[in-house]
UniProtKB/Swiss-Prot annotation:
Gene3D superfamilies: MFS general substrate transporter like domains. The lineage of its organism: Eukaryota, Fungi, Dikarya, Ascomycota, Pezizomycotina. InterPro entries: MFS (IPR011701), MFS_dom (IPR020846), MFS_trans_sf (IPR036259). PROSITE patterns: MFS. Disulfide bonds: none annotated. Keywords: Cell membrane, Glycoprotein, Membrane, Transmembrane, Transmembrane helix, Transport. Induction: Expression is increased in clinical azole-resistant isolates and by the presence of itraconazole. Expression is down-regulated by tetrandrine and posaconazole in a synergistic manner. Expression is also induced upon amphotericin B treatment. Its main location: membrane. It is a multi-pass membrane protein. It is found in: Cell membrane. Major facilitator superfamily transporter that confers resistance to azoles such as itraconazole. This is Major facilitator superfamily multidrug transporter mdr3. Pfam families: MFS_1. It comes from Aspergillus fumigatus (strain ATCC MYA-4609 / CBS 101355 / FGSC A1100 / Af293) (Neosartorya fumigata).
Length: 528
């Protein structure tokens, strides 16, 4: 009995040690471990503003993608680009997604080390400044200047996304409220892209397209100012020790490798793979990423979100239509799905949605109504996006300590935004080669869409294997846990009976039962 009491006391001590508390930053000592402490959310109305600011990051980031993508042909006319130069116009969108997906890799870690609030406010200010400059590039009539401004504009969202998720992850412990906030963050993605596409199209059609960039820049500056007031301060930390923890070599290798690889894929449709610098950049990118792999030992898969970027661009160019905000419903449903379905099967369902939507797009007849294959493909693929994003961010956020929330958010956002950027390059390459540089555009569009089907099928296969393996591991883990509990219960009973010599027959029976458990691997219902 003494041993049982000691074991129970040790279990309680470990449980209390692992429990994470929620306190305000002012109450936390400077040496407090962030892995053990959650920040207290702002009180009252400020908490609603706090959540709104965090969700606005996704709204504005995807908005900056949509307000150029939808009126892309009008934007191209400003720089003297017609329909025959569609492959060159992909840089107006791809340059932005390139830096978003690349610099996210290090932005989350910077927030972990120097304060997510500081990096978030800096990101809003950077986003606003380069939105103004991007709009002013229309006066230069230089597509190179505009693409450069768009690429630099993308650094702002790269700073915003992981640090917004990190702040939410440090503020709300695992639970229903956290799941709802992360799902609201996901809702902002389709809503932001759709509304910005509408607003951008209206400005481009009736006013002038740079005005949408200038309008959004005003919003960036306002949110930065409100964020300084609403967002709680980060915990104090030793800046020197934090600097020593930053992996400068891995950061440089990761960013450089992703940049080289993406530039080569997006330039290939323009100049062709036979151009020496294109394949030199590709080879160099793979070599640098190989060095990064040796440095970091981390290589996430990015196939699913690639095919959505392919479909969205080529459907927009081919049919001149935009998808409505079908992504809101699945994002709101995800918290409830996460409560009843394991993460592995959720990811398999998401990849199946990507695959089904891509197949519908690839097989759509030319003169078919928008409300047939095209509409339903958007509806189905929305479930893929809005299940995979909140599920993966919530799973990673719950799995890592509070002090590493920024790094985990960077991982998910790097996968999404970089895949969008490189997906445009892959689709452009396939389209240019199959259509013979625009001779047969429909054939090229079909080929680009079917390539997305192949990538989605590969992603679904990997997700299905992961789901089955995860299910087997969980079942084995539950069985082992039950066996340990049964054995501990019997051993405790035997130990208690040793203190009462007059109950020898019960001790003998329990000993036989314990031997049976050891031989068969578990208790039978009859024995119980």
């Amino acid at each position: 009995m003494l041993a049982m009491a000691a074991s129970a006391e040790e279990t309680n001590r470990q449980s209390n040690a692992g429990r994470r508390s929620v306190i305000s930053p002012s109450e936390a000592p400077p040496e407090a471990e962030q892995s053990d402490v959650y920040q207290a959310p702002p009180p009252g109305l400020k908490e609603w503003l706090f959540i709104l600011i965090l969700c606005s990051t996704q709204l504005f980031v995807q908005g900056a993608f949509g307000y150029i993508l939808i009126p892309l042909h009008i934007v191209g006319q400003t720089f003297g680009q017609g329909p025959s130069e569609a492959t060159r116009m992909t840089w107006h969108v791809g340059g932005y997604s390139l830096t978003v997906g690349t610099f996210i890799l290090i932005a989350g870690k910077l927030g972990d080390l120097y304060g997510s609030k500081r990096i978030l406010v800096l990101g809003w200010a950077w986003f606003g400044v380069w939105s103004v400059i991007g709009g002013c590039s229309a006066f230069t009539h230089s597509p190179v200047f505009f693409d450069t401004a768009r690429a630099l504009q993308g650094i702002g969202p790269a700073l915003l996304l992981p640090n917004a998720l990190a702040i939410a992850g440090r503020t709300y412990p695992p639970g229903k409220k956290k799941n709802m906030i992360f799902s609201a963050f996901a809702v902002a993605a389709p809503l932001g892209c759709f509304t910005a596409g509408v607003v951008g199209s209206v400005f481009a059609q009736y006013v002038w397209w740079p005005w949408v960039m200038w309008t959004y820049s005003i919003g960036c500056f306002i949110i930065a100012a409100v964020g300084l007031w609403v967002i709680p301060s980060d915990y104090p930390r030793c800046q020197k020790a934090a600097t020593l923890q930053f992996d400068y070599i891995g950061s440089v290798l990761g960013v450089a490798g992703l940049l080289l690889l993406n530039i080569s894929w997006n330039q290939a449709p323009i100049d062709g793979w036979s151009t020496p610098y294109v394949y030199v950049l590709l080879i160099g990118g793979f070599l640098v990423l190989g060095l990064f792999e040796l440095q970091e030992r981390r290589a996430p898969g990015i196939r699913s979100w690639i095919n959505f970027a392919m479909c969205l661009l080529w459907i927009q160019q081919c049919s001149s239509r935009q998808g409505p905000s079908q992504g809101i419903l699945p994002a709101l449903a995800t918290p409830y799905l996460m409560a009843v379905i394991t993460s592995g099967w959720l990811m398999a369902i998401a990849c199946a949605a990507f695959l089904g939507g891509c197949i519908l797009q690839s097989t759509a007849p030319v003169e078919q109504s928008y409300w047939m294959n095209t509409f339903w493909s958007f509806v189905i693929m929305a479930w893929g996006m809005d299940i995979s994003f909140p599920a993966s961010t919530t799973i990673l956020s719950d799995a890592v300590p509070v002090k590493h929330q920024g790094a985990s958010a960077s991982l998910v956002n790097t996968v999404i935004n970089y895949s969008i950027a490189i997906g445009l390059g892959i689709a452009g390459t396939v389209e240019a080669e199959v259509s013979h540089q625009g001779v047969n555009q429909l054939r090229g569009y079909r080929a680009a869409l079917w390539s997305s089907v192949g990538l989605a099928a590969l992603a679904f296969g990997i997700a299905l294997v992961f789901a089955v393996c995860t299910f087997q591991e969980q079942r084995s883990s539950r069985k082992s846990s039950q066996e340990r509990e049964q054995r501990a219960c019997i051993e405790g009973c035997i130990l208690g009976l040793t203190l009462t010599p007059d109950r020898e027959w019960e001790r003998v029976e329990l000993g036989r039962l314990l031997s049976h458990v050891s031989q068969t691997g578990g208790l039978r219902s009859q024995s119980v």
